[in-house]
Amino acid sequence: MRRVLLGDQATPSPHLTAKGRAAPSQPAQAVHVHVAPEAGLAVPDVYFSAGYGHADSWASGGDWVLIEAFDGRWQMPLHLRSVDGGGRDAASPYGYSGVYAHPELTERDVHAAWTATQAALRDLGAISVVLRHSPLVPQAPLLPEHQIVVSGHPTRLVEIPDEETAWSAMEGRSRTAVRKATKSGLVAIVRRADTTDVLGSGSFRLLYSDTMRRRGAAPAYHFGDDYYSALLDGLGDNLLTAEVRGDGGFVLAAALLLQHQDRLHYHLSGSAAGAVRTGCTNLLLWEAIRFAARVGLHEFHLGGGIARDDSLYQFKRSFGGREVEYRMSGLVLDERTYHQRVRARAAILGVTEDALLQFGFFPAYRAEMP
């Protein structure tokens, strides 16, 4: 893990180049690359944290870095991954991070931070960067060169002033499912996760893996022991588990939840085959909302689906809250090398470079067969 610190943050507009080479006549300080992040840096959400980033590196196969400036008012967590043919590229960790820019940063500050960030990434050998922009924390404005990869992707944010208000805000069908589950004897609990929850033989692990297999999920949604162990080690008490048990204590549904300050995130979940009709997942999410209300959390981010009209998003919508939009962007940092890698990938796929670029995947050299 590395933290990239951009310049002298007391200087309003640092003019930086890689490896500390300040441009002539400019009073900028060096770009410093540290072996590990300094302890105590406040992050705006869990997806910016070293604990989460280190865990996600087991899934992404990359090296986690945090680019940070202005005493933490500019933060960009990334994974650096090797690229076939040489070089590396960067991408936000799985989830919701992007580029945090504190609202107090001026336009000049933001411009300086973007300039220094690009220089630092090039110095780290990055050909391109993919950013997963959080709808929950203030984001830096995009540069004109950014390519929009995903826009208008809906996710649900449930605000929790208190339990009664949250219950009233839910759609009737979801409340009915919760009542049905409770009446049939299902019991839900939310607690701090422990080692037994992340073991391969734990209820959550078994249910999640089985659910992903039933849905034919891509390999990126299957996680190994190292990932879960690192997640528990990195987040500690901020990693929670939710369970719903039926007759005989059999676990019908389970989830991992991430806590950060007054916000809860619905991270991963699974359920037993055929158990959905019992209302177990409705009860699980309602218990998470109740837990949040009890301990003083005010937001529960459920994430989204593929589109507004798909069944997963409609299910999450039934818990009330409001829609917030997630987006992804891409930025080419080394045009020459980028196009070399795209041409090489196009040749492997048997298409032209233009056809691969028009396919819409970013970075294009990581695209699968169109």
Which sequence ranges carry the predicted segments?
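Active-site/acyl-donor-binding loops of N-acyltransferases
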Residues: 1-30, 80-83, 142-165, 297-370
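A conserved beta-strand-loop-helix scaffold within acyl/acetyltransferase catalytic domains
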Residues: 2-85, 133-157, 161-277
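Short, high-confidence coil segments that cap the C-terminus of an alpha-helix
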Residues: 62-64, 123-126, 295-297
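Conserved acyl-donor/pantetheine-binding loop and adjacent beta-alpha core of acyl/acetyltransferases
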Residues: 82-96
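Short, flexible active-site-proximal loops enriched in glycine and acidic residues
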Residues: 86-89, 124-128, 149-151
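A gly/proline- and charged-residue-enriched helix-loop-helix capping module
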Residues: 92-140
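Aromatic (often tryptophan-rich) hydrophobic motifs at membrane interfaces
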Residues: 113-116, 227-340
